[in-house]
């Protein structure tokens, strides 16, 4: 059985041979492919009337394929193009009656040759300009209307339908095609409201274009873009229905991004809806890999009352806020909360919730970021509770990897009496901290900042040789030589007073202290050190002494 071509099937036409129709061979460039059967009785796609399967089966025609196509809901799109009123849109769409301005162009009657196409183009240009205000008023601003009309007209040029095809019909066809696609889209959207197992199911589904679009029609490609834009502009209710709830949507990567977009770009109602949906699950979403971003966004845009509601839920149980602060994702929410709280009530809630777990916050990487945010965004008076805890637990905090860093920030952010108390406590324990893998950094910090350095020197006096031979303590001694000139004579005297000075020269750490002392000291102090080094010139070829003698520091 022969089939007529489908509108838009241009890519496949080249693979078929033009055999003509009704005994008239096609030699024009207009037809470029399918065998166009003129038998309107046996071709179901050219028969605009209801297909009489009984008579065809009686004539021995195999209707298997047609019946299968009917079950697949594949209809004759050509009939849709020429008989709008025959499709009722299942109660949603009513076809419009075609209205023609003037008579049809003679180039559309019967076979269309090259000259006819040329005349048709001229006629189309004239009619397009003449009817521009009426037939094309709904497409103002689209400079490609003429080319689209020409494309649709040439596509239907070989149609033997006596009703012909004019530019007005092109416009109507395009209107009908877009409205039909919109109708199909609405049906598909209604179907997509059924809850799916996968939260991404809604986004993975796409509205199938008309069957003729598979042939590569440019007009239908444009329609597909239009449909995509409509999908992108879906409202919050539609998106939430596809996931089932805002809670489930917030725990999905793509869904959370969409919700953040609604919070950023949506109206007040959208923000209120999202807030009311997540407020009861703010603890779980705040520690979720994706949900925490939505909670942060809500904290930024919500008002003080809503922000207080979030804070009340995060502090509803003792130690809960500390637990969230230590969480890899929850710490971001707490930090954002600290950045945005402004009222005394909110700050009081934060302070009272963090105090019970202070040591945990100082020792943990995520927790110390929360403390740093408090130091940065709270006033010195509001940070008093942090500085008091830092002073009280100075050694416990300073001897941890992250705690020593937080204490350095506490020193820099503190002022007045709290600053003095904290520095005095660090200086008082400087000998112990100087020998610690992490505490030595805190001692070096206050030496560099020259805060409490005199007290540090007092605590280290008499222990410079011991510290010089240690991996961590040697760094503290070098810092004293560099930043406190008054300490140099005391340090050198302790070094040269050692009975086995050669041992210090060959020590992997002490040799660096001696090099630093030779470069920083002057006068009598330096002369005494050089004299001591010369006595061990026979050691200059040893691995560590080689560095001292190669620099010729002792010869200056």
Swiss-Prot record:
Domain PUM-HD: 215-556
SUPFAM superfamilies named in the record: ARM repeat
Keyword tags: Cytoplasm, Repeat, RNA-binding, Translation regulation
Organism: Arabidopsis thaliana (Mouse-ear cress)
Gene name, Swiss-Prot/TrEMBL: APUM11
PROSITE patterns, per the entry: PUM, PUM_HD
Entry protein name: Pumilio homolog 11
Upper classification of the organism: Eukaryota, Viridiplantae, Streptophyta, Embryophyta, Tracheophyta
Tree of life domain: Eukaryota
Function field: Sequence-specific RNA-binding protein that regulates translation and mRNA stability by binding the 3'-UTR of target mRNAs.
Subcellular compartments: Cytoplasm
GO biological process: one example: regulation of translation
């Amino acid at each position: 059985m022969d089939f007529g071509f489908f509108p838009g099937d241009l890519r496949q036409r080249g693979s078929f041979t033009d055999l003509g129709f009704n005994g008239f061979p096609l030699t024009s460039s207009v037809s470029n492919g399918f065998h166009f059967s003129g038998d309107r009785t046996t071709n179901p796609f050219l028969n605009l009337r209801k297909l009489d399967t009984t008579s065809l089966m009686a004539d021995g025609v195999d209707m298997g394929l047609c019946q299968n196509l009917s079950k697949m809901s594949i209809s004759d799109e050509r009939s849709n193009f020429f008989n709008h009123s025959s499709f009722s849109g299942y109660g949603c769409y009513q076809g419009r009656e075609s209205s023609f301005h003037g008579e049809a162009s003679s180039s559309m009657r019967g076979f269309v040759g090259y000259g006819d196409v040329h005349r048709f183009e001229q006629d189309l240009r004239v009619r397009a300009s003449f009817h521009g205000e009426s037939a094309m008023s709904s497409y103002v601003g689209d400079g490609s209307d003429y080319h689209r009309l020409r494309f649709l007209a040439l596509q239907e040029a070989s149609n033997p339908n006596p009703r012909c095809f004019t530019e007005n019909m092109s416009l109507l066809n395009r209107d009908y095609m877009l409205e039909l696609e919109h109708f199909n889209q609405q049906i598909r959207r209604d179907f997509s409201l059924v809850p799916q197992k996968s939260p991404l199911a809604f986004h993975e589904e796409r509205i199938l274009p008309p069957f003729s679009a598979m042939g590569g029609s440019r007009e239908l490609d444009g329609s597909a873009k239009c449909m995509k834009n409509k999908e992108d502009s879906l409202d919050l209710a539609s998106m939430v229905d596809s996931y089932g709830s805002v809670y489930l949507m917030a725990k999905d990567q793509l869904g959370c991004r969409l919700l953040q977009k609604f919070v950023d770009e949506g109206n007040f109602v959208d923000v209120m809806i999202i807030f009311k949906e997540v407020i009861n699950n703010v603890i779980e979403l705040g520690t979720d890999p994706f949900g925490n971003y939505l909670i942060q966004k809500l904290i930024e845009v919500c008002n003080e009352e809503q922000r207080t509601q979030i804070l009340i839920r995060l502090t509803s149980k003792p130690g809960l806020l500390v637990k969230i602060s230590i969480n890899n994702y929850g710490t971001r929410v707490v930090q954002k909360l600290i950045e945005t709280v402004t009222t005394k009530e909110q700050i009081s809630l934060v302070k009272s919730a963090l105090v019970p777990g202070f040591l945990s916050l100082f020792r943990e990487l995520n927790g110390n970021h929360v403390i740093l945010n408090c130091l940065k965004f709270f006033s010195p008076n509001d940070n008093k509770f942090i500085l008091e805890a830092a002073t009280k637990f100075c050694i416990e905090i300073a001897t941890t990897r992250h705690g020593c860093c937080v204490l350095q920030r506490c020193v820099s952010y503190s002022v007045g009496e709290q600053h003095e108390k904290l520095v005095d406590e660090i200086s008082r324990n400087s000998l112990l901290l100087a020998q610690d893998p992490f505490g030595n950094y805190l001692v070096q910090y206050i030496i560099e900042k020259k805060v409490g350095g005199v007290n540090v020197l007092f605590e280290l006096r008499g222990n410079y040789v011991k510290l010089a031979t240690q991996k961590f303590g040697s760094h503290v001694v070098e810092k004293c030589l560099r930043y406190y000139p008054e300490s140099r004579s005391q340090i050198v005297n302790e070094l040269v007073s050692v009975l086995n000075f050669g041992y210090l020269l060959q020590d992997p750490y002490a040799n660096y202290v001696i090099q630093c002392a030779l470069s920083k000291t002057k006068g009598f102090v330096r002369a005494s050190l050089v004299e001591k080094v010369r006595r061990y010139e026979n050691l200059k070829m040893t691995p560590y002494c080689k560095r001292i003698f190669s620099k010729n520091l002792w010869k200056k």
